[in-house]
Every structure is written in structure tokens, then in C-alpha cells.
Amino acid sequence: MDKELLQSTVRKVLDEMRQRPIPLGVSNRHIHLSAQDYERLFPGHPISEKKALLQPGQYAAEQTVTLVGPKGQLKNVRLLGPLRSVSQVEISRTDARTLGIAAPLRMSGNLKGTPGIRLVSPFAELELPSGVIVAQRHIHMSPLDALILRVSHGDMVSVAIEGDDRGLIFNNVAIRVSPDMRLEMHIDTDEANAAGADNPHAFARLVGPR
């Protein structure tokens, strides 16, 4: 195989890889807890795994809490593990209206100036002073995925949701690159409902910047 043919073949393979479907993960409301807050809410009860998630080492725990806001509450909100350094609550816009909380759109971990909420477990209550957000839609990927897709950590891209009669293009999708991450797009339940993505055939496809 001559050099020109080899280069052409490589370009074709890479183009096909850039068009491959991106797995879609729909994130229902959930919480992340610090070790200190977990011990206050579940004293003497070790965190236990209910279901492994796609991202390595992450899982849905057996433990749940009730979120209590100024206007309402949401029960059976799942804890995701492992425990973190700072507690965080991720809800949808619809959830925020139910609770009566003005939760800002943020990337995970960007909690400065966010509202708090009361957490109620079967054993205790905890007033979280801050940490409630509506999560920015994003795509997790490895450095190799980023190289193939020609994107970098922190980029904003546009993504088409396909596999359903409705479909939708989402702009302002953040790229999150980490060596221990697998390729997966995360959207919340409001976004999934709008795109008709609440079915096993739905997937995402990168269509351009922003």
C-alpha cells in the first residue's frame, strides 16, 4: 500500500469514527455527599452500591434522601457514589420549580453562589448551605476520544439527539476530558423529554461547534 493510499484510508476511518454514535445517559435528580455529610445523614451505615454506572468507579447507591425546599419536596432522591469532597445536589428546571429554588445552570463542582437545601434521610436532617445546581449538559470522553473528535476539554459543541421520531439539536454542550472517562453524553430529564430520548434507541452525534 503506497503512502497516499494509506493516508486516504486513515482519513476515511477517522471520519467514520467521528460520526459514530455517542452513548446517551439521562441523569435523574441525584445527590453527591461529602464523607462528613454522609455520616451525619446515615450514621453508622456504610454506603452500599445498588447499580454500577458507565463511568468507571461510579455507581448509584442504595441510600436515598428527601429534598425539602421552600415550596415543596422531592422524595427518594438517589445518592451517587463514591463520596466526594463537597456535597452537591443536581436537579432539573422542573424540579427547581417544584422545590421553589432558583438553581443556576452550572458545571459539576462549580458551586460558588449556589442555593442550599434541606436533606432528610431516614435517620437525620441536614441543612446544606449551598450546592444545588441544574447541571450543564456535557459529554465525558477520554483524551483519545477527544483527539478523534477534534475537541478539547472545556469546548462547547452542538449535538444532535437521534433514534427517535422527535429528535433535537442541543447547543452549548460542554466537553469534559479525563483519562478515566468513557464516551457518554449526560442530559437531565427535562432535556431527555424534549428530545424524545427516554428510550434505549436514542443516541447523540456531534454536529459542530456550540
From Swiss-Prot:
There are 2 Zn(2+) ions per monomer; Zn(2+) and CoA bind inbetween the 2 domains in each monomer. One of its GO terms (biological process) is propanediol catabolic process. Phosphate binds at R84. Zn(2+) 2 binds at H138, H140, H186. Disruption phenotype: Unable to ferment 1,2-PD, impaired for aerobic growth on this compound. GO terms for cellular component: bacterial microcompartment. Induction: BMC production is induced by growth on 1,2-PD vitamin B12 medium. Keywords: Acyltransferase, Bacterial microcompartment, Metal-binding, Transferase, Zinc. InterPro entries: PTAC. Coiled coil: none annotated. CoA binds at V26, S27, N28, K71, R78, N193. GO terms for molecular function: acyltransferase activity, transferring groups other than amino-acyl groups; metal ion binding. It is an enzyme of class 2 (transferase). Pathway: Polyol metabolism; 1,2-propanediol degradation. Belongs to the PduL family. Involved in 1,2-propanediol (1,2-PD) utilization in the bacterial microcompartment (BMC) dedicated to 1,2-PD degradation by catalyzing the conversion of propanoyl-CoA to propanoyl-phosphate. Also able to catalyze the reverse reaction. Also has phosphate acetyltransferase activity to a lesser extent. Required for optimal growth on 1,2-PD when the BMC is intact. CoA is regenerated within the BMC (for use by PduP) via this enzyme, although there must also be cofactor transport across the BMC. Directly targeted to the BMC. The 1,2-PD-specific bacterial microcompartment (BMC) concentrates low levels of 1,2-PD catabolic enzymes, concentrates volatile reaction intermediates thus enhancing pathway flux and keeps the level of toxic, mutagenic propionaldehyde low. Monomer, when purified in the absence of the encapsulation peptide (EP, residues 1-27). The EP may influence oligomerization. The N-terminal 20 residues target foreign proteins (tested with eGFP) to the BMC. Formed by 2 beta-barrels, each is capped on both ends by short alpha-helices. This is Phosphate propanoyltransferase. The gene is pduL.
